[in-house]
Amino acid sequence: MTELIMESKHQLFKTETLTQNCNEILKRRRHVLVGISPFNSRFSEDYIHRLIAWAVREFQSVSVLLAGKEAANLLEALGTPHGKAERKVRKEVSRNRRFAEKALEAHGGNPEDIHTFSDFANQTAYRNLRMEVEAAFFDQTHFRNACLEMSHAAILGRARGTRMDVVEVSADMLELAVEYVIAELPFFIAAPDILGVEETLLAYHRPWKLGEQISRNEFAVKMRPNQGYLMVSEADERVESKSMQEERV
């Protein structure tokens, strides 16, 4: 992986690209898709403000990606009733959106460029990509297992975050929670097709084991040449080199 330091008048950010192709996309700095997770204490108003300020300074165009309705599945997997889970997700995503809108407006970005997974549910490009992911999930055991492993880590991470004692993660819990992974993956492999941009980097603060496997061509699902992944951290913290093993929602 390639590591760079980007300096501004206010804040240092460290970036790490997943592949050499990601690094080439980064050099051109045409577009970045900033990922913001719900129920993650990192994404405070101040952090989102700093992150988006950095993104607007460094890239020609900035979009923000928020969770969709599938985030409720993780809460349901841990026992939250369906209706309550949906309400909690709507409230949290609204909070994330409000902070992102405020930051984009403050730094010259476009508040209209904030999206959730669910916004594209009926879009042809997104639906085709999701079908591609779902086909691999059902046809390739090793891809299915990798997705379920990510869901397992997310369930345990969410349980830790809420101080819940989970004795065993059942198959039903995994099947419910994995919907979030499936909904998110199209933005990892081909976000330009969805957003209508030439190329982009999906920016997040951690490595992603499943993404690393995709970038190594271990599955039928492939990252497109105009798609990259970028790990971003503030200078006083370390971009973790270990594979991601915490919740993304």
Swiss-Prot record:
Single Gene Ontology BP annotation: pigment biosynthetic process
Effect of residue 98 to A: Strong decrease of L-leucyl-tRNA(Leu) binding, but moderate decrease in the cyclodileucine synthase activity
Catalysed reaction equations from the record: 2 L-leucyl-tRNA(Leu) = cyclo(L-leucyl-L-leucyl) + 2 tRNA(Leu) + 2 H(+)
Effect of residue 158 to A: Moderate decrease in the cyclodileucine synthase activity
Record has Transferase as a keyword: yes
First-level EC class: transferase
Keywords attached to this entry: Transferase
Effect of residue 205 to E: Strong decrease of L-leucyl-tRNA(Leu) binding
InterPro entries for this protein: CDPS (IPR030903), CDPS_sf (IPR038622)
Residues of the active site: 37
Record-annotated site: Could be involved in aa-tRNA binding: 88, 98, 180
GO molecular function: aminoacyltransferase activity
UniProt xrefs under Pfam families: CDPS (PF16715)
Residues with site note (Could have a critical role in the catalytic mechanism): 40, 184
EC number(s) on file: 2.3.2.22
Gene3D superfamilies: Cyclodipeptide synthase
Chain positions recorded as substrate binding sites: 40, 180-184, 204, 209-210
Effect of residue 180 to F: Strong decrease of L-leucyl-tRNA(Leu) binding
Effect of residue 180 to A: Moderate decrease in the cyclodileucine synthase activity
Record's function text: Involved in the biosynthesis of pulcherrimin, a red extracellular pigment. It uses activated amino acids in the form of aminoacyl-tRNAs (aa-tRNAs) as substrates to catalyze the ATP-independent formation of cyclodipeptides which are intermediates in diketopiperazine (DKP) biosynthetic pathways. Catalyzes the formation of cyclo(L-Leu-L-Leu) (cLL) from L-leucyl-tRNA(Leu). Can also incorporate various nonpolar residues, such as L-phenylalanine, L-leucine and methionine, into cyclodipeptides.
Quaternary structure and interacting proteins, as annotated: Monomer.
Protein family: Belongs to the CDPS family.
Name by which UniProt lists this protein: Cyclo(L-leucyl-L-leucyl) synthase
